[in-house]
């Protein structure tokens, strides 16, 4: 079970709303979100309803302003509680679409895809175990995408506008 609290103002001030499960539309509960406190669980928050738009990964901790979660604005309109995973993590990445071309396998976090695999683009991937966060830049920066187990035959399947991938991180409550 997870628990996340959204606050309209910075530093956990103003009107607040608490969630313990997925919420496809947060608009009725607050008009803007400038701080968040995650008491338990791992969450994806989204700038638009129905888990659309820019997405941001949050784990247990305090985020006193939206820059702390690498947000671009104070617009948060939906959230998703990522189910906990208590096993191994495994993903295959491919340099071409349709799971073709050079393949590399990951079982742990990757701070820089370019340094580790000599790739700046990943065109398809197969998440075999666990959920992962894909970041468009190295060092877990830039746009973020939640990857659940399954095949992603092209970058559009995970919602990206291009195949640029900088880093990958396992979804875990604590690092």
UniProtKB/Swiss-Prot annotation:
Listed InterPro entries: Beta/Gamma-Crystallin, Beta/gamma_crystallin, G_crystallin-like
Name of one Pfam family that matches:
Crystall
| A molecular function (GO) term | structural constituent of eye lens
- Which segments carry the region annotation Connecting peptide? 84-88
| Record carries keyword Repeat | yes
Residue spans making up a coiled coil are none
Query: Which keywords does UniProt give here?
Result: Eye lens protein, Repeat
Could you tell me which residue ranges the Beta/gamma crystallin 'Greek key' domain spans? 2-40, 41-83, 89-129, 130-172
Q: Does the keyword Repeat apply?
A: yes
Annotated GO biological processes are:
lens development in camera-type eye; visual perception
According to the UniProt entry, the note on domains is: Has a two-domain beta-structure, folded into four very similar Greek key motifs.
- Its quaternary structure? Monomer.
This molecule's function is given as: Crystallins are the dominant structural components of the vertebrate eye lens.
Say which family it is in: Belongs to the beta/gamma-crystallin family.
Q: What is this protein called?
A: Gamma-crystallin B
Q: Please report the organism this UniProt entry assigns to the protein.
A: Macaca mulatta
């Amino acid at each position: 079970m997870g628990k996340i609290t959204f606050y309209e103002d910075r530093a956990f001030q103003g009107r607040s709303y608490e969630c313990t499960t997925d919420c496809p539309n947060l608009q009725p509960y607050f008009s803007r979100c400038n701080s968040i406190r995650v008491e338990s669980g791992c969450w994806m928050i989204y700038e638009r309803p129905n888990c659309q738009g820019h997405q941001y990964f949050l784990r247990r901790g305090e985020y006193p302003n939206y820059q702390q979660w690498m947000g671009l604005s104070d617009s948060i309109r939906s959230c998703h509680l990522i189910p906990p995973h208590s096993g191994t993590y495994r993903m295959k990445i491919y340099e071409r679409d349709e799971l073709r071309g050079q393949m590399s396998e990951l079982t742990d976090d990757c701070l820089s895809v370019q340094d580790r695999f000599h790739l700046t683009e990943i065109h398809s991937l197969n998440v075999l175990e666990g959920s992962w966060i894909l970041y468009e830049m190295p060092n877990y920066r830039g746009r973020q995408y939640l990857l659940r187990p399954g095949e992603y035959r092209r970058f559009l399947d995970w919602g990206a506008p291009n195949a640029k991938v900088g880093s990958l991180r396992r979804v875990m409550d604590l690092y």
